[in-house]
Regions:
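Fe(II)/2-oxoglutarate oxygenase catalytic core
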Residues: 2-341
């Protein structure tokens, strides 16, 4: 009896404990349920997150914006297109020292009517002939007919010391090169209201050959943003003559001006290269630029640079053929190397 009665009491006690546990569990469950957001609260939370993301996106895109603008496309045939700009203060302060060479306004221009396609074709032949004698191991090769510098591997050689050069550069090449340089110089003077005699050819002036080959040296990395006046102290006006067509002879490789508008906004202004197209611009910070990386094909162009400072002026290149002709007239011979100006 005592064992049985004890057992009954024990069962009752256990039963009582179970009720307490269930009560505590129920209380705990109720407490947990009260801390979980309701469906309405969750919707409000997500709405706030979406709103904050939207506001952040609006602030970003109105504060940090890069617009794109096409200044000249490959399909267009342009008589003349210009874009005036305010001169950067350092550029204006320096160029104001040179009477007859102060632009009426800084800016840029592009024209397809300065150089003929036939002239561009002859210069393209000259470039290809020169680059047969040497090319960079990376994607950017240069040929400077004034200094004789020619990319070869990871270094430069003097093209006029190569015997083959005399056979490649013809009288037609030379005459067209000089004639085109004079026409481009006149175009710069006309567009910026300069005295053409106050404008002088300067170094470096060179042919370029760009491909998608991986860069091997810093000289192959042509795509970095820069200001010509900061890179080359002698520059006051920069021009480019394109010898091949964007979208036909090569892809990528567009010329890009970078116009900064305020602290964070900028506009990329594109020129699509076209055979015989000439672009020109003042060389100060108002015309920061770069060239897109070429993704296929070969891009040929000539950079023709001008200065207002006679100290940095250089003469037209004196080719080996000229020396040979002079040597024959004098009854002598020479080594066929370029004479320094």
């Amino acid at each position: 009896m005592s064992d049985g009665g004890g057992s009954v009491r024990q069962r009752k006690k256990s039963s009582g404990d179970g009720s307490g546990n269930r009560a505590r569990k129920a209380k705990s469950t109720g407490s947990s349920g009260s801390s979980t957001p309701s469906t309405a609260q969750q919707h409000q939370m997500w709405a706030r997150i979406v709103l904050m993301v939207g506001i952040a996106a609006i602030v970003y895109f109105t504060t940090f914006r890069t617009r794109e603008k096409k200044f000249a496309t490959q399909r267009e045939v342009l008589e003349l297109r210009t874009q005036p700009l305010d001169c950067s203060r350092p550029y204006l302060d320096e160029i104001s020292k040179f009477a007859g060479c102060i632009p009426n306004q800084c800016g840029r221009f592009v024209s397809d009517k300065i150089v003929s396609p036939a002239e561009a074709g002859i210069l393209l032949d000259l470039a290809r002939a020169g680059f047969e004698l040497g090319q960079s191991a990376g994607g950017a090769s240069i040929l400077d007919l004034h200094s004789g510098a020619l990319s070869k591997g990871t270094q430069f050689v003097n093209v006029y010391r190569l015997p083959e050069a005399k056979k490649l550069f013809t009288n037609q090449h030379i005459n067209v090169y000089r004639h085109v340089k004079a026409k481009v110089q006149q175009a710069v003077a006309d567009n910026f209201r300069l005295n053409v005699d106050a404008l002088h050819l300067t170094h470096p002036t060179f042919f370029s050959r760009l491909t998608n080959v991986t860069a091997k040296t810093i000289h192959d990395e042509y795509w970095h943003e820069h200001v010509d006046k900061e890179t080359y102290n002698s520059f006051h006006f920069t021009t480019l003559l394109y010898l091949t067509d964007y979208g036909k002879d090569f892809t990528g490789g567009r010329f890009v001006f970078i116009d900064n508008e305020g602290k964070h906004n900028r506009t990329h202004v594109y020129i699509e290269p076209k055979r015989a197209r000439v672009s020109g611009f003042t060389s100060g910070a108002e015309n920061m630029h770069h060239v897109e990386q070429v993704t296929g094909g070969v891009r040929y162009a000539i950079t023709i640079s001008f200065t207002c400072d006679r100290e940095y002026a250089m003469a037209d290149p004196k080719f080996a053929l000229d020396d040979d002709e002079e040597g024959e007239e004098e009854g002598g011979t020479n080594e066929g190397r370029m004479n320094e100006p």
